[in-house]
Design a protein with these regions (language model features):
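Thiamine diphosphate
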Residues: 1-175, 180, ...
């Protein structure tokens, strides 16, 4: 890819904003819902300027009622629209747990109905958010059939995965890490692109140990790989990117090569994503 085909460097949060803007221009069925996303531009300013550009019917400020927001979005999705909900902080996604797991996730199995809904969930610690604004709740949804879950680690993936999620006919939980918002940058392609859901990526090849991770922990893994490389230990870093559907083939291929694996995630050890992958590796 030549520099002529790249944009100026953008941050992780700007990549998310770009994806929303481009998809709203591309498809008039796409609209946004969330607390303070209109006039205020969102808690993290992802949608700043969107209200003026697209109007109040496509950028909907909502009451503080996560269950109500998601319920309304599900109804809109079932009527043919493509809502993107901003959950101001992922911690409060639990308030909409029933709507997500019992309605959005199960519609395909109950009626064969598509629910093209995206829920953006800013998650993770490292930003002085305290116990109520720093959680990683992705594990709560990991065993809910009917959902797709993504967790990008780079601006490129943040934009490409969000565009893919918006175009998908299924409900997608899009976990964006707050710590990465303005700490990392990358030059993105000028042309339209998506990152396919369900495809992991080897961010660093290695021969000794497979380190499997996602989100902000990818950067910690790459730092660790550089340090261990000086001691002669060659780490392979696998970025899951999509948690559901899980790219088992990429995981298995890496572990077959190295015969050793480390699972790294920012979450509870018990019942987390890492525990499930560990079980899969043990079984297979």
């Amino acid at each position: 890819m030549t520099t002529a085909t790249l944009t100026q460097e953008v941050t992780y949060v700007d990549a998310i904003s770009q994806a929303l803007d481009e998809e709203m221009r591309r498809d008039e069925r796409v609209f946004l819902m969330g607390e303070d996303i209109g006039a205020y531009g969102g808690a993290f300013k992802v949608t700043e300027g969107f209200l003026k550009k697209y109007g109040e019917w496509r950028v909907l400020d909502t009451p503080i009622s996560e269950s109500g927001i998601v319920g309304a979005a599900i109804g809109a999705a079932m009527m043919g629209l493509r809502p993107v909900v901003e959950m101001q902080f992922a911690d409060f996604i639990s308030c909409a747990f029933d709507q997500i797991t019992e309605v959005a996730a199960k519609n395909h199995y109950r009626w064969g109905a598509a629910v093209p809904l995206v829920i953006r969930a800013p998650f993770g610690g490292g930003v002085h958010g305290g116990p109520f604004h720093s959680e990683c709740p992705e594990g709560w949804f990991f065993h809910s059939p009917g959902l797709k879950i993504v967790a990008p680690s780079t601006p490129y993936d943040a934009k490409g995965l969000l565009k893919a999620a918006i175009r998908d006919p299924n409900p997608v939980l899009y976990f964006e890490h707050k710590f990465l918002y303005r700490r990392i940058k990358a030059a993105l392609p000028q042309k339209d692109y998506i990152v396919p859901l369900g495809k992991a990526e080897v961010k660093r090849t290695g021969r000794d140990v497979s380190l499997i991770t996602y989100g902000a922990m990818v950067h910690l893994a790459l730092e660790a790989a550089e340090l261990l490389g000086k001691e002669g230990i060659d780490l392979e870093v696998v970025d899951l990117r999509t948690l559901i559907p899980l790219d088992k083939e990429t995981i298995y291929a890496s572990v077959r090569k190295t015969s050793k694996v480390i699972l790294l995630h920012e979450d509870n050890k018990t019942g987390g994503i890492g525990a499930e992958i560990s079980a899969l590796l043990a079984e297979d």
